[in-house]
UniProtKB/Swiss-Prot annotation:
<dbReference type="InterPro" id="IPR020094">
    <property type="entry name" value="TruA/RsuA/RluB/E/F_N"/>
</dbReference>
<comment type="similarity">
    <text>Belongs to the tRNA pseudouridine synthase TruA family.</text>
</comment>
<feature type="binding site">
    <location>
        <position position="109"/>
    </location>
    <ligand>
        <name>substrate</name>
    </ligand>
</feature>
<dbReference type="InterPro" id="IPR020097">
    <property type="entry name" value="PsdUridine_synth_TruA_a/b_dom"/>
</dbReference>
<dbReference type="GO" id="GO:0160147">
    <property type="term" value="F:tRNA pseudouridine(38-40) synthase activity"/>
</dbReference>
<dbReference type="InterPro" id="IPR001406">
    <property type="entry name" value="PsdUridine_synth_TruA"/>
</dbReference>
<comment type="subunit">
    <text>Homodimer.</text>
</comment>
<keyword id="KW-0819">tRNA processing</keyword>
<keyword id="KW-0413">Isomerase</keyword>
<dbReference type="InterPro" id="IPR020095">
    <property type="entry name" value="PsdUridine_synth_TruA_C"/>
</dbReference>
<dbReference type="GO" id="GO:0031119">
    <property type="term" value="P:tRNA pseudouridine synthesis"/>
</dbReference>
<dbReference type="InterPro" id="IPR020103">
    <property type="entry name" value="PsdUridine_synth_cat_dom_sf"/>
</dbReference>
<dbReference type="Pfam" id="PF01416">
    <property type="entry name" value="PseudoU_synth_1"/>
</dbReference>
<protein>
    <recommendedName>
        <fullName>tRNA pseudouridine synthase A</fullName>
        <ecNumber>5.4.99.12</ecNumber>
    </recommendedName>
</protein>
<feature type="active site" description="Nucleophile">
    <location>
        <position position="51"/>
    </location>
</feature>
<comment type="function">
    <text>Formation of pseudouridine at positions 38, 39 and 40 in the anticodon stem and loop of transfer RNAs.</text>
</comment>
<dbReference type="GO" id="GO:0003723">
    <property type="term" value="F:RNA binding"/>
</dbReference>
Length: 264
């Protein structure tokens, strides 16, 4: 039996999603709990591997098991075993040809900036604090230049191992809700650090260090060194993964926290 799980996690105390030797990872915690539920070793495959400090409200994984278990064992049962900063949001039997990574048609991220002169005392693990005022109108104006199919070499990590930098951004927007500035981005797939590098550039535009059209110039340059510094991990969330309807993967509230669901 193949099962898909929806996973939510606060990545602050983890060295990323992927299991690694001698460090704490989200994958390790989920696999350990699943192995106890199934009474055999379980390996999971995720939709997208997030970096150290990055969070998830819409991560999707799959695993195989022959253990006769009701789905409630993989939701309520798992949540009794997992640490409080990881939770299962749904469990769903799926077809054998479903693959959490390769069946995905799009991923969606949100980046949350607490834009206030003074730092806050709550939620500080889940947002990036930035004390200079950001012009979200200019940031939103810049978004148009990245929507579409382009070579995103200027926005990939130097050590990114992807074979091609061609990606298609389907949606990119910037909104302000009080002291919070939210960047919402959806693409067929992302390069390593792509969202955080785009965020860093948008923040410089929000500071009026660059004009919105600068993003188009960066696309044409195809040179990472010409772009802004990578934004911090703390404000980034994987909030949704799209799959073909045939797999019937449940949709859960995007979040994080107070942010409304917006169909795009």
């Amino acid at each position: 039996m193949r099962v898909a799980l929806g996973v939510e996690y606060n990545g602050a105390r983890y060295s990323g999603w992927q299991r690694q030797s001698h460090v704490n990872s989200v994958q390790q915690e989920v696999e350990t709990a699943l192995s106890r539920i199934c009474n055999h070793p379980v390996a999971i495959v995720c939709a997208g591997r997030t970096d150290a400090g990055v969070h998830g409200t819409g991560q999707v994984v799959h695993f195989d098991t022959d253990a006769p278990r009701d789905m409630v064992a993989f939701t309520l049962g798992m949540n009794t075993l997992l640490p409080k900063d990881i939770a299962i949001r749904f469990a769903q039997p799926v077809a054998d040809d479903f693959h959490a990574r390769f069946s995905a048609t799009a991923r969606r991220y949100r980046y949350v900036i607490y834009n206030n002169p003074l730092r806050g005392a709550v939620l500080n693990e889940g947002v990036t604090h930035f004390h200079h005022t950001l012009d979200e109108t200019k940031m939103q104006e810049a978004c148009q230049y990245l929507i579409g199919k382009y070579d995103f070499t200027s926005f990939r990590a130097i050590h990114c191992q992807a074979n091609t930098a061609i990606r298609t951004i389907q949606h990119l927007s910037v909104q302000r809700q009080g002291s919070y500035v939210i960047i919402d981005i959806k693409a067929n797939a992302f390069l390593h650090h792509m969202v955080r590098n785009i965020t860093g550039c948008l923040m410089d535009i929000g500071l009026h260090k660059q004009q919105p059209v600068w993003l188009k110039e960066l696309l044409d340059l195809k040179e990472r060194a010409k772009a802004s510094a990578t934004a911090k991990a703390a404000g980034l969330y994987l909030v949704d993964v799209d799959y073909p309807e045939q797999f019937n993967i449940p949709k859960t509230p995007l979040g994080p926290l107070f942010l409304p669901d917006i169909s795009i």
